[in-house]
């Protein structure tokens, strides 16, 4: 699993002109899944992201987590993160989970996130989404599980 974790001032996901997920101050997480991913990977990723200390404390140090700042969490599935771009001029997606497995993994991630973090929103697996964000910092991390 590959995730792009972004600290945002605000973010939203639109599908066909309708907003389906929106947060203010918090984290936008783009998620790409591999065939080897499991529920254990998802639990580990979610725990790390929610508790990752990337928000500033009163002295300006990155010392607070999403939980500490009571921020929003916006989860967006993005299979293109798994693209193999090493050869040629067209990406290969052979490293990505199948659509069925990817949907199952994303649904599991969303269910777990909603149970452990009240302000959780999401995009829609398989949809053509427009993602809008104001990256805060910018603070962006690439995490692999």
UniProtKB/Swiss-Prot annotation:
A Gene Ontology molecular function term of the record: Ser(Gly)-tRNA(Ala) hydrolase activity
Entry's localization field: Cytoplasm
Keywords, ordered alphabetically: Cytoplasm, Hydrolase, RNA-binding, tRNA-binding
Subunit-structure text: Homodimer.
NCBIfam families the UniProt entry points to: D-aminoacyl-tRNA deacylase
Stated role: An aminoacyl-tRNA editing enzyme that deacylates mischarged D-aminoacyl-tRNAs. Also deacylates mischarged glycyl-tRNA(Ala), protecting cells against glycine mischarging by AlaRS. Acts via tRNA-based rather than protein-based catalysis; rejects L-amino acids rather than detecting D-amino acids in the active site. By recycling D-aminoacyl-tRNA to D-amino acids and free tRNA molecules, this enzyme counteracts the toxicity associated with the formation of D-aminoacyl-tRNA entities in vivo and helps enforce protein L-homochirality.
Name used for this protein in its record: D-aminoacyl-tRNA deacylase
Lineage, uppermost ranks: Bacteria, Pseudomonadati, Pseudomonadota, Gammaproteobacteria, Legionellales
Gene name of the record: dtd
